[in-house]
């Protein structure tokens, strides 16, 4: 007596929502677990050069598949395992040391990407790539150049996390939940990021209308300190625990959801901004982007003040200088 009788003659269906995570360090695994817990893929592939660590993480996840809604977790140092990925999340690279700026990491990580990106494209030519490794804006540009993909399919996690930190800190001061505070941080993910004070609001009430000095040195409420805290927060967490991983993991899962579920939600992520806000170079930095099944479906042109546009250009110049 046979236990299971196959009915479909063909071999197994190819996955429809396969997600690959490249790099199984602290950030890669936080992204992986966040994506799994939100049921965003039907197959998950992991890739890394450290074979033992990779196999260990794979086995550990497989042992918990009973508690998840994903049927298959695979891993290998060979990129063949990533074939047919819909989305590839790149977290590989060398990590920021305590006190090291994100931009200092550039050359070390560009070399890593030269090995990774062509392999991804070889096995998943139709994928969308989400770059998380720092300095994310520069590496997203590098990925775009190395991959040959159209610009809408190469996305950097950008200031999605900076905006989340900003919204959390501002909301905390106001005694409300972060989701009820609307605020955007644009530009570089890092030291020259731009807080859009002109667009900060709660329940449709614009904060700059209530306090025209908001975010400036003359602000009695010292809101400028909140943005400084956003910029400094990663450095502080790294100083305390050695790395940041949970918040970026949640942030990446949120972006993943908008892409694989074709949600057309707006997120501040890194995209090619040439010819926007008077930026002439092919530089990647964060603007509000509509994320859907095709990647960045469109860019929302925010009405910024002259000072904010100037800061954005400065952000672009900093990045292009690299």
Curated annotation (Swiss-Prot):
Classification via CDD domains: LDH_1
UniProt-annotated catalytic positions: 189 (proton acceptor)
Domain of life: Eukaryota
Binding, NAD(+): 48-53, 95, 134
Pfam families to which the protein is assigned, alphabetical: Ldh_1_C (PF02866), Ldh_1_N (PF00056)
CC per GO annotation: cytoplasm
Gene Ontology MF terms in the entry: L-lactate dehydrogenase activity
Keyword line: Cytoplasm, NAD, Oxidoreductase
Residues reported to bind substrate: 102, 134, 165, 244
Catalysed reaction, written as an equation: (S)-lactate + NAD(+) = pyruvate + NADH + H(+)
GO biological process, one term: lactate metabolic process
Listed InterPro entries: L-lactate/malate_DH, L-lactate_DH, L-lactate_DH_AS, Lactate/malate_DH_C, Lactate/malate_DH_N, Lactate_DH/Glyco_Ohase_4_C, NAD(P)-bd_dom_sf
NCBIfam families on file: L-LDH-NAD (TIGR01771)
Similarity remark: Belongs to the LDH/MDH superfamily. LDH family.
Assembly, per entry: Homotetramer.
Function in brief: Interconverts simultaneously and stereospecifically pyruvate and lactate with concomitant interconversion of NADH and NAD(+).
Name used for this protein in its record: L-lactate dehydrogenase B chain
Taxonomic path: Eukaryota, Metazoa, Chordata, Craniata, Vertebrata
Gene giving rise to this polypeptide: ldhb
């Amino acid at each position: 007596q046979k236990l299971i009788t196959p009915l479909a003659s063909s071999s197994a269906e190819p996955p429809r929502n396969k997600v690959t995570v490249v790099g199984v360090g602290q950030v890669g695994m936080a992204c992986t677990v966040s994506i799994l817990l939100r049921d965003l893929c039907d197959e998950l592939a992991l890739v890394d050069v450290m074979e033992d660590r990779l196999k260990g993480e794979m086995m550990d996840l497989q042992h918990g598949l009973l508690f998840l809604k994903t049927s298959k977790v695979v891993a290998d140092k060979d990129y063949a395992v990533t074939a047919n990925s819909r989305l590839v999340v790149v977290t590989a690279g060398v990590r920021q040391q305590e006190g090291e700026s994100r931009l200092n990491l550039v050359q070390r990580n560009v070399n890593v990407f030269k090995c990774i990106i062509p392999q991804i494209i070889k096995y998943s030519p139709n994928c969308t790539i989400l770059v998380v490794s720092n300095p994310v804006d520069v590496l997203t540009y590098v990925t775009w150049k190395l991959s040959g993909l159209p610009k809408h399919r190469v996305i950097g996690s950008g200031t999605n996390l900076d905006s989340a930190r900003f919204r959390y800190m501002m909301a905390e001061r106001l005694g409300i939940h972060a989701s009820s505070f609307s605020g955007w941080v644009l530009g570089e993910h890092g030291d020259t990021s731009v807080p859009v004070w002109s667009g900060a609001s709660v329940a449709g009430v614009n904060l700059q209308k209530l306090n025209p000095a908001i975010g400036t040195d003359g602000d009695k409420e010292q809101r400028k300190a909140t943005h400084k805290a956003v910029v400094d927060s990663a450095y502080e967490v790294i100083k305390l625990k050695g790395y940041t991983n949970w918040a970026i993991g949640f942030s990446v899962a949120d972006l993943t959801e908008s892409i694989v579920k074709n949600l057309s939600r707006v997120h501040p992520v890194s995209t090619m901004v040439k010819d926007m806000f008077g930026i002439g170079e092919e530089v990647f930095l964060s603007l509000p982007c509509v994320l859907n099944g095709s990647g960045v479906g469109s860019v929302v042109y925010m009405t910024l003040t002259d000072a904010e546009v100037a800061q954005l250009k400065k952000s672009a110049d900093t990045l292009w200088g690299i």
